[in-house]
């Protein structure tokens, strides 16, 4: 665990341990609950920066794992916030909860595509990157190598969920091999690899029990009003 005067930055192992403890017998959270809270936070952060008046069309890029589940939840909330999301979801899972999340999007009329990514990028106002999370540790392969390469080249604003796809959770993107999003929404606590992230940075995790904050000695900012996210760009900038 890496700490400074105002913020805790987690390693991959610590992030996994906190998730496991949240879903353990003491706290009783389910994966579905955590996914819902994470997706809501991501949707709220995107909406704050890229409102639907100027950025109505959102291309939500979902991977096959939990990160993709966060994206499915976010797409639904973005629709309710007045955006016009489209799901890029080329590698769907057979897990029942993910099927339910997808069905919820489809009943709202949210388009779902699995190909023609470059065409979809040209028809959107902002991208939500929910492809790979903090457990990913290899070179991106098809069908996700194309969008991650495109992220490096596009001028369309990108919002990434928790860790930008392709980045290492602990070392980040030191050689600038991968794209740097405009906005990052860290979940629970920011990860070590994003400590030097230069863009606008939000934290979503307004559900962490005091017992976990205490046992992991987490240093986290206060959330304003009833918001599910807090901007930590200024706090992070002060720590550089």
Curated annotation (Swiss-Prot):
InterPro entries, A to Z: YjeF_N_dom, YjeF_N_dom_sf, YJEFN_prot_NAXE-like
UniProt keyword NAD, yes or no: yes
Keywords assigned: Cytoplasm, Isomerase, Metal-binding, Mitochondrion, NAD, NADP, Nucleotide-binding, Potassium
Residues annotated to bind K(+): 67, 129, 165
One Pfam family here: YjeF_N
Residues reported to bind (6S)-NADPHX: 66-70, 133-139, 162
Catalysed reactions, semicolon-separated: (6R)-NADHX = (6S)-NADHX; (6R)-NADPHX = (6S)-NADPHX
Superkingdom of the source species: Eukaryota
UniProt keyword NAD present: yes
Cofactor(s) it depends on: K(+)
Subcellular localization(s) per the UniProt record: Cytoplasm; Mitochondrion
EC number annotated for this UniProt entry: 5.1.99.6
Predominant cellular place of this UniProt entry's protein: cytoplasm
GO MF term set: metal ion binding; NAD(P)HX epimerase activity; nucleotide binding
Cofactor note: Binds 1 potassium ion per subunit.
Domain YjeF N-terminal per the UniProt entry, residue ranges: 15-224
Cysteine pairs bridged by disulfides in the record: none
One annotated Gene Ontology cellular component of this protein: mitochondrion
PANTHER family: NAD(P)H-HYDRATE EPIMERASE (PTHR13232:SF10)
Function description: Catalyzes the epimerization of the S- and R-forms of NAD(P)HX, a damaged form of NAD(P)H that is a result of enzymatic or heat-dependent hydration. This is a prerequisite for the S-specific NAD(P)H-hydrate dehydratase to allow the repair of both epimers of NAD(P)HX.
Family: Belongs to the NnrE/AIBP family.
Protein name: NAD(P)H-hydrate epimerase
Organism of derivation: Puccinia graminis f. sp. tritici (strain CRL 75-36-700-3 / race SCCL) (Black stem rust fungus)
């Amino acid at each position: 665990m890496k700490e400074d005067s105002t913020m805790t930055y987690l390693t991959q192992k610590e992030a996994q341990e906190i998730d496991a403890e949240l879903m353990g017998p003491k706290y009783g959270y389910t994966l579905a609950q955590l996914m819902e809270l994470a997706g809501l936070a991501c949707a709220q952060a995107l909406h704050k920066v890229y409102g639907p008046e100027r950025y109505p069309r959102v291309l939500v890029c979902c991977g096959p794992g939990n990160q993709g589940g966060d994206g499915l939840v976010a797409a639904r909330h973005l629709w309710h916030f007045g955006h016009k999301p489209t799901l890029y979801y080329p590698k769907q899972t057979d897990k029942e909860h993910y099927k339910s999340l997808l069905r919820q999007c489809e009943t709202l009329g949210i388009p779902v595509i699995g190909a023609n990514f470059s065409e979809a990028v040209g028809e959107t106002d902002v991208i939500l990157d929910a492809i790979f999370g903090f457990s990913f540790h290899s070179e991106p392969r098809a069908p996700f190598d194309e969008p991650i390469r495109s992220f490096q080249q596009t001028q369309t604003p990108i919002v990434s969920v928790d860790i930008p796809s392709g980045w290492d959770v602990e070392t980040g993107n030191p050689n600038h091999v991968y794209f740097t999003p405009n906005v990052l929404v860290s979940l629970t606590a920011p990860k070590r690899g994003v400590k030097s992230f230069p863009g606008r940075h939000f934290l979503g995790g307004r559900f962490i029990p005091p017992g976990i904050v205490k046992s992991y000695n987490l240093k986290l900012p206060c959330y304003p009003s009833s918001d599910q996210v807090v901007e930590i760009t200024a706090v992070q900038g002060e720590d550089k």
